[in-house]
Regions:
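Intrinsically disordered, low-complexity boundary segments flanking structured domains
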Residues: 20-23, 78-79, 108-112
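Contiguous alpha-helical scaffold segments within structured protein domains
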Residues: 51-70, 74-77, 100-101, 152-197
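Divalent metal-dependent hydrolysis catalytic cores, especially in the metallo-beta-lactamase
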Residues: 91-93
Length: 197
């Protein structure tokens, strides 16, 4: 079986490729995926096969642990108490909900995301190493122009109809993201960093 990538850079045409993700140490350019702690990193090497004819999504054999709605709500109540007592400042609670779907519609879903979000980076990645992922994000992780790199700290969402100003909580959340990106760049050896906004 082959690995697959499909991605669309904002306001450009989608790219769809068949190939293999391979482990690497250094690279000049390419499509890269990594696990959360960066202990496993892969770069994509494409071939000339047809994406649409060859696409069979990969699924990992180790399913994530799913909790019940009741357990999730109990965790939520415990976290609310921690927030009220200022023992924690920021918490993101999520749960995995298992549902069935037709995996052969993945390409169609990718194309719908491209149409719905023309200014977002849209991706469909299917790898024996990571499983299958699909999504769209407006956030620019890294963009380079000549010898300069640019990143974006983006936190919080707001309804287009709600034109009220941001709350102190939303400003704090934005600052946490900005601080994290800055710290990560500094740990990576970046010395000259200019912040705006």
């Amino acid at each position: 079986m082959y690995d697959f990538i499909a991605y669309r850079i904002p306001n450009q045409n989608p790219v769809k490729k068949v190939g293999k993700f391979k482990t690497f140490k250094d690279f000049d350019k390419g499509f890269v995926i990594s696990n959360f702690d960066q202990s496993k990193t892969y770069t994509f090497e494409s071939n000339e096969l047809s994406f649409e004819q060859e696409f069979i999504p990969h699924f990992l054999s180790n399913e994530p642990h799913c909790i019940s709605k009741e357990t999730y709500l109990n965790f939520g109540n415990e976290l609310l108490e921690l927030l009220k007592s200022n023992q924690v400042q920021k918490v993101v609670l999520s749960r995995i909900k298992k549902t069935s779907f037709n995996s052969q519609l993945m390409i169609e879903r990718f194309e719908k995301l491209c149409t719905a979000y023309p200014k977002a980076f849209v991706y469909l990645i299917s790898s024996t190493h990571a499983g299958t992922w699909i999504g769209a994000t407006p956030e620019t992780l890294i963009r380079s122009i000549h010898t300069h790199g640019f990143s974006m700290a983006l936190a919080g969402t707001k309804d287009k109809k709600n034109q009220n100003s941001w709350s102190p909580k939303e400003y704090d959340e934005q600052q946490w993201v900005s601080d994290y990106i800055l710290e990560t760049l500094q740990l990576g050896g970046q010395k000259e960093i200019e912040q705006q906004g």
